[in-house]
Amino acid sequence: NSRLCMSSAVAGYTRSLGSDGPPCCYEDIDHCGVAVLIGTNTAECHPVLFQRLLKRKKRNPNSLTIVVIDPRQTNTAKAADIHLAVAPGTDLALLHGMAHLVLRENGQDVSFIDQHTENYKPFFDVVTRWTPRKVARFCGIPEKRLRDVAELFHRRQRVLSLWSMGVNQRREGTAVVQGLINLHLLSGQIGKEGAGPFSLTGQPNAMGGREAGGLAHLL
């Protein structure tokens, strides 16, 4: 189950953080200031979780900004404050472009990067090539929308990213997961209440089986 359902998240967490386990929990949904939903039709695939977000939004509209990154106009996208309808398969470029803008605006968390990360220079060299104009054209979105979402990562506190099979079930899924985690590491949006990269499991016990060592290479 874990190998078929969300193996990209497994590999992405392990490569980026050294351990296969989301550094977030469901309670973070109640405390995030920004919820970025990428590659997930949460309204239909995780309805209980999505209703939890909407109830909070309805109770205090200014407390939460919902961003949806999805080529499709899903029910999830219809409820978003910002919908980035990127061209299919371009979300890794989008994440690199957002990281580029965080760096350009000096929005990186220098202290966090120095204390808790490594290989910053190679990452810097990659994302600096993904300029806003290049990314906007590649993804098929307005450049202003790209800038608006990138600003949320360094101008707002408590950014929580959530994804599921739209990211995981693809050839470059692990790279996209790492790109998202890198964006959180760059901006220091991790390891604090209401912030972090949060993979949503697609099937029952996809996480529990891994926690119990139920993967072939761990037996």
Report each predicted region and the residues it spans:
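Cofactor-pocket helix-loop regions in the catalytic cores of large enzyme subunits
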Residues: N1-N205, G209-E211
